[in-house]
């Protein structure tokens, strides 16, 4: 059972055509590029991939296409989380059939389950599959925070092996690291907290900004893990404006805007997400110019 999905995992955008249908050909090209530019793994149809507005059929085809393109060269992690346990089980099983390496399960949103409800949800999905599972905590979107004690309970299940922690709470991450067994990997879900999470023994990051500077983020991680904390800090501070600038409005609007400015025609976001405002687009353009990315 793999628990190491790599240090740098990119939460991949979903490219759309002008009519907002999924652009599977560009998905292939982007997946190749991300792996070539430093990504050890890819999350497909996660938050950054606009999972709420993708159909089940689109998700499964995205999983299949990315496995076909980069399977064996990078870890392919399917976003199969839902606020319906039965739907999450069904999509996880479909993802397993097309050959993904792992699945990522977001904390169920909107219906606000208790900690016991969260435990039962994730346990049920885990029992339905042989795939390794990465939990995904993002209370700013789900309105529910999975507590370190609940994660520790779930870590006793063989195929629940990692968590993407995007709550932005370093105290919570510290408590997770204290309670969790060796081999259970904690990933930062925030680009700007990658280095702090590494300092607490975290594994790496599930990144958005790696679409733009994957190689440089990999250099930062490698510097830290090899003991060159001075260089790691220098790279972190260099990239910090980009880490913050890609979240000036709802993700993935800024990163899709940035990719478009860099020549990647990944298309707009599906409604109800709106495009970047003129002021936001100008801010992103200025940031990319200052980083010499365009």
Swiss-Prot record:
What organism does the UniProt record list as the source?
A: Pelotomaculum thermopropionicum (strain DSM 13744 / JCM 10971 / SI)
Q: Cross-referenced SMART domains, in alphabetical order?
A: DHDPS
Per the Swiss-Prot or TrEMBL record, the active site comprises 136 (proton donor/acceptor), 164 (schiff-base intermediate with substrate)
Location(s), subcellular: Cytoplasm
Family indicated by similarity: Belongs to the DapA family.
Name it: 4-hydroxy-tetrahydrodipicolinate synthase
Q: Name one GO biological process term.
A: lysine biosynthetic process via diaminopimelate
Name the major location.
cytoplasm
- Keyword Amino-acid biosynthesis among UniProt keywords: yes
Q: Does the keyword Transmembrane helix apply?
A: no
A single Gene Ontology CC annotation of this entry is: cytosol
Q: Where does pyruvate bind?
A: 48, 206
Q: Which UniProt keywords apply?
A: Amino-acid biosynthesis, Cytoplasm, Diaminopimelate biosynthesis, Lyase, Lysine biosynthesis, Schiff base
Pathway participation: Amino-acid biosynthesis; L-lysine biosynthesis via DAP pathway; (S)-tetrahydrodipicolinate from L-aspartate: step 3/4
The cross-references to PANTHER family, in alphabetical order and at most eight, read:
4-HYDROXY-2-OXOGLUTARATE ALDOLASE, MITOCHONDRIAL (PTHR12128:SF66), DIHYDRODIPICOLINATE SYNTHASE (PTHR12128)
Catalytic reaction equation(s): L-aspartate 4-semialdehyde + pyruvate = (2S,4S)-4-hydroxy-2,3,4,5-tetrahydrodipicolinate + H2O + H(+)
List the residues marked with site Part of a proton relay during catalysis: 47, 110
The entry lists its GO molecular-function terms as: 4-hydroxy-tetrahydrodipicolinate synthase activity
Q: Which EC numbers characterise this protein's activity in its record?
A: 4.3.3.7
PROSITE patterns in the record, alphabetically? DHDPS_1, DHDPS_2
Assembly and interaction partners = Homotetramer; dimer of dimers.
User: Gene name, please?
Assistant: dapA
Q: Top EC class per UniProt?
A: lyase
Main role? Catalyzes the condensation of (S)-aspartate-beta-semialdehyde [(S)-ASA] and pyruvate to 4-hydroxy-tetrahydrodipicolinate (HTPA).
